[in-house]
Amino acid sequence: MPRKSQGAKKTVTEQFEVLVRDLAAELKKHYGARLVSAVVFGSVGRGSPHPDSDVDVLVVAEPLPDGRMPRVRDFAAVKNALAARLTRLAEEGIHTTLAPIFKTPAEVRRGSLLFLDMIDDGRVLFDRSGFWRDFIQDFQERLRRLGARKIITGDRWYWDLKPDYKVGEIFEI
């Protein structure tokens, strides 16, 4: 890989790496002891962001306010702390936004199909006591027992959660 000269412009991926590093620091600062886990996923988690990629981030914290909007208002401190960096990125042609998903540990344990995207593409920024690691390993094991498969077609994919599914059958992940 060619080296860049001093002062060379950072690549899109490098710019996102700096943003993610700063995001992790601001999450720790704002949520403090409430922060259980933080996981970046999607194109940024895969390490293949585009200039218009958003930063998908799962924030697991306890306690969290009830309801989405109070949680968004709580997260505003993190967003505000990163506002100058986001503005600089926009000036350089990287038009990104933060796209947080908020869950308590109990809500994570109840599960979500969203977590399928985090199996391969999730990048852990913070994980107190291995909460996320343990959860995602258990989730993967449940998928394995079902025979679930990730089907990749070109640059897209989908999950066949239970290949031997029979009409009317009820199953849990």
Regions found by a protein language model. Give the residues of each.
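Catalytic core of pol beta-like nucleotidyltransferases
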Residues: M1-R34, G45-D52, E62-I173
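Short, glycine- and small/hydrophobic-rich beta-strand elements in well-ordered beta-sheets
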Residues: R34-V40
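Short beta-strand->loop micro-motif that forms the acidic, two-metal-ion catalytic signature
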Residues: V57-A61
